[in-house]
């Protein structure tokens, strides 16, 4: 099968935005106009083509980035729909990694919103060229020029309109094209056949002003155009388009278009802008990788180079099983052939290759450089792995994923759920690198951790729907520790002698605090054999075994020293078991003399917020028993660094989101253990029924 679309006529783009700016609706319209859908699905009716998980249709948000293929004016456009919720930033990161360009969708009433800032920063990190689509021009309060202003103020982006709206809110009827200098009016409801007319007289001055600004901005990026501009020569529309394309590809310029996807206006000109200004696979730099011998190498977008690709998403599909989405960077791949997973060192067979159209799929026999497709039949491949030619191996740069920040305990409701839960958690962890499931050695609970409360809610919900596993989700648990603050000499004596073979073990041990992080240290200071040498390891083992159960509330004892300096033994009745028990009794007796305390994990927290929220956020950190450790300005945001007890960080993501209208982001990781205030320690001991793990 010959290549249907040349590399130059291929576009891999993402649609990115704040939650509710209308990304999914925009993608829907693209699919409608490019002839892939015959009936338009509305998101708020829960019938959208891109949102194909039940939860997405219920909640009206996009969780998984579905990749879909469309055709427009002789070009192939592969579109990845990305989620706009903070908890799903990993989905955005992984889709940006395999895109060449993106359309940033703004809400005309709000302009740049918090999640837009986050996604925009991620796109800048990956050097992704962007076109901006100001959507919802029909909405009450829609203001195109205000929205363009927010691009400058909040993102410091060199963004300029290449269109202006004709009217706004319910009078929005078309757009002015600042390159062709004409007007497009939409007569019918589906926006299929816009009419080209003269620019209305009352908007002529505004159009001239913005055309002038556009020409000047483009000329600034290109010396030849600058010379023409300064000499007062006319810049042709071909030169203008070439200048915009060059600036956009270099991520120095962002063309802005407008419309309303919901009312079917302005979507086709936006698609034209995608073809005109966003890169083909041949316009982006070659991808770098490492060869088996450690040498660096590049792979270019070319069918004749060795096959190389990156798996960017794994999903379980109800019909075909496990689907691995991948982006081909070089070479070609036939279905039924073998490839090497060079990241894992495994050979994989590609059963079938599917080109995805939201939730319907088309089987193809070959994929070419620059394509995005899904493979069926890969067993060991996970997100971020490289798939390549067996003979010409290479490992491409992988993706980095953030560490999970929230953890909750989960338990199956019945025995039948127990077995299925393990499989379900393993499958979900395979699909999502920021989700972890593990068993807590101390409590025996299954703990799941992820990027936020919504993230975990949705995963538990998916267990129920897709894997039919019913589970109870507990409150998040904190792993406390215990230690000693004072030194003391303590006796431990275990004697049982009631006829026949008895038990006799007797030790004197000096306990005391050790340096933080040094753990448990045991010293043998016995002189003259008062405790025979063969029983010394038993004393140490007895202490180590008892440490796990603590002396106050059953939490492990850490950072203590124990020096065995005296004791006695019995020729017949002493044995290892007796000395083990004597040592653990000594440790328990130390609880009365060594001033034991409870320690809690302290998290290093970094909060990034717009300046106006600084006072509230600092106050909130203090109310959570946190200590502010430092502050700095980063761009137009403030960064607060603090240490906060983990026990007081639950629910923080939700608090921060509502307290800053979603504009604040935070990261936290474990830093050190610190003593719990007395009043809280008493509550913890009470909740655990004192040392509830005696004997």
UniProtKB/Swiss-Prot annotation:
Q: Where in the cell is it found?
A: Cytoplasm
InterPro entries on file: EFG_II, EFG_III, EFG_III/V, EFG_IV, EFG_V, EFG_V-like, EFTu-like_2, G_TR_CS
Entry's Gene Ontology BP terms? ribosome disassembly
Q: State the UniProt keywords alphabetically.
A: Cytoplasm, Elongation factor, GTP-binding, Nucleotide-binding, Protein biosynthesis
Under the heading Pfam families, the entry gives: EFG_C (PF00679), EFG_III (PF14492), EFG_IV (PF03764), GTP_EFTU (PF00009), GTP_EFTU_D2 (PF03144)
Q: Which GO terms describe its molecular function?
A: GTP binding; GTPase activity; translation elongation factor activity
SUPFAM superfamilies linked to this entry: EF-G C-terminal domain-like, P-loop containing nucleoside triphosphate hydrolases, Ribosomal protein S5 domain 2-like, Translation proteins
Would you tell me the Gene Ontology cellular component terms? cytoplasm
Positions annotated to bind GTP:
17-24, 81-85, 135-138
The organism sits in which domain of life?
Bacteria
Question: tr-type G domain: from which residue to which, for each copy?
Answer: 8-282
Q: Which family does it belong to?
A: Belongs to the TRAFAC class translation factor GTPase superfamily. Classic translation factor GTPase family. EF-G/EF-2 subfamily.
Functional description taken from the UniProt entry? Catalyzes the GTP-dependent ribosomal translocation step during translation elongation. During this step, the ribosome changes from the pre-translocational (PRE) to the post-translocational (POST) state as the newly formed A-site-bound peptidyl-tRNA and P-site-bound deacylated tRNA move to the P and E sites, respectively. Catalyzes the coordinated movement of the two tRNA molecules, the mRNA and conformational changes in the ribosome.
Stated name of the protein: Elongation factor G
**Natural source organism:** Listeria innocua serovar 6a (strain ATCC BAA-680 / CLIP 11262)
